[in-house]
A protein has these predicted regions:
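Switch II (G3) loop of P-loop NTPases
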Residues: 37-56
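Conserved catalytic-core segment of NTP-binding enzymes
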Residues: 50-147
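Short, glycine/acidic-enriched loop or turn micro-motifs at the edges of active sites
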Residues: 9, 46, 108
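Beta-strand-loop-alpha "switch" segments that mediate conformational coupling across diverse proteins
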Residues: 121-181
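C-terminal accessory extensions appended to soluble enzyme cores
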Residues: 174-206
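Walker A/P-loop NTP-binding active-site region of P-loop NTPases
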Residues: 1-24
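Glycine-rich, highly charged phosphate/nucleotide-binding loops
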Residues: 20-31, 51-56
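Phosphate/oxyanion-binding active-site loops and adjacent basic polyanion-contact surfaces
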Residues: 23, 45-49, 78-83, 193
Length: 206
């Protein structure tokens, strides 16, 4: 199950996955659902984090229902500072360092060069796990998937040979041929991105 806590980000719902939208102030309802669920992902919007953590503090040991707190960070200075604040907030309410995992998002080439503030902070405070191998590299696929409303999984499962369609249908309309060309390219991108995501997952939860 995926729970989106007032997330203003492009959540899984925008990629065709079923998402349970919830308000941050309804933490007790979320806690009950977590207790009843075997597997769940909670996507907390930045603007809802403080209220979410407040609700967690009010229900004793509720954080025990959450195995990991995964924090994605982008390289801009503001994003890094917000991530540091989030790690500090989690540490202050007693979340163990090994449960706080940082994912470096939209990496251009080198995590150490692009995320110095986060890396230096975690190295000093030792209150989270920040492995430079947990890096999702910048790729145009994510925007394209959002626009088409499909997931990487659905794209990879699509067995259509779009290259063959282009080759074998020279009289098809320009619109059809353009669509087939797009899909062929997206499938190639998806294979590369999927390898990257599998590697990040293995790094985070090894």
């Amino acid at each position: 199950e995926i729970f989106a806590i007032e997330s203003v980000n492009e959540t899984a719902a925008g990629l065709g996955l079923e998402v349970d939208q919830m308000a941050a102030k309804k933490f007790r309802d979320l806690h009950k659902k977590l207790v009843l669920s075997d597997n769940a992902i909670i996507d907390v919007g930045n603007g809802s984090l403080e209220q979410f953590l407040s609700g967690m503090v009010q229900i004793d040991e509720s954080h025990e229902e959450i195995d990991f707190f995964v924090i994605p960070v982008e390289s801009d200075t503001k994003g890094q500072k917000e991530t540091i604040k989030t790690v500090m907030a989690l540490a202050e309410i007693g979340i163990e360092p090994q449960k706080i995992r940082i994912v470096f998002n939209k990496v251009e080439s080198d995590v150490a060069d692009e995320f110095p503030h986060v890396l230096n902070y975690v190295k000093k405070e030792k209150n989270a796990i920040a492995d430079v191998k947990a890096a999702i590299f910048e790729n145009e696929l994510f925007d394209a998937l959002g626009a088409k409303g499909i997931t990487i999984g659905a794209l990879l499962a699509d067995e259509t040979d779009y290259k063959a369609l282009i080759k074998n249908n020279p009289d098809a309309s320009a619109k059809e041929r353009s669509h087939w060309g797009d899909m062929h390219g997206l499938k190639a991108l998806a294979r590369s991105v999927n390898r990257n995501l599998d590697s990040v997952f293995s790094t985070l939860f090894k």
